[in-house]
């Protein structure tokens, strides 16, 4: 069986935290900011943690990723 490879798209989008959780960035942050409130834009800047339902699948894509 061939080696598993790290999914490069996922490797660019997710980072592991010190406790082993996965950090991600929010969607809706690339354009069309005029109709978004300042509060919404401020909240979108912060990182989010991957939900437990998605964790197993994403963690499998990042098999060998250290950080």
UniProtKB/Swiss-Prot annotation:
- Gene Ontology cellular-component annotations: cytosolic large ribosomal subunit
**Which family is it part of?**
Belongs to the bacterial ribosomal protein bL35 family.
Q: What PROSITE patterns is this protein classified in?
A: RIBOSOMAL_L35
Domain of life per record: Bacteria
Q: Which UniProt keywords apply?
A: Ribonucleoprotein, Ribosomal protein
Q: Where do the segments described as Disordered lie?
A: 1-41
Matching Gene3D superfamilies: 4.10.410.60
Q: Which Pfam families match?
A: Ribosomal_L35p
Keyword Transmembrane helix listed: no
Which gene holds the coding sequence for this protein?
A: rpmI
In the record, biological process GO terms are: translation
**NCBIfam families (alphabetical):** rpmI_bact
Instruction: Tell me a Gene Ontology molecular-function term this record carries.
Output: structural constituent of ribosome
Can you name this protein?
Large ribosomal subunit protein bL35
Presence of keyword Ion transport: no
């Amino acid at each position: 069986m061939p080696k598993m490879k790290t999914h490069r798209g996922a490797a660019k989008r997710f980072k592991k935290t010190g406790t082993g959780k996965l950090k991600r960035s929010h969607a809706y942050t690339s354009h069309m900011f005029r109709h978004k409130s300042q509060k919404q834009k401020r909240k979108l800047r912060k990182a989010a943690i991957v939900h437990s339902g998605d964790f197993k699948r994403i963690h499998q894509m990042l098999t060998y990723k250290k950080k």
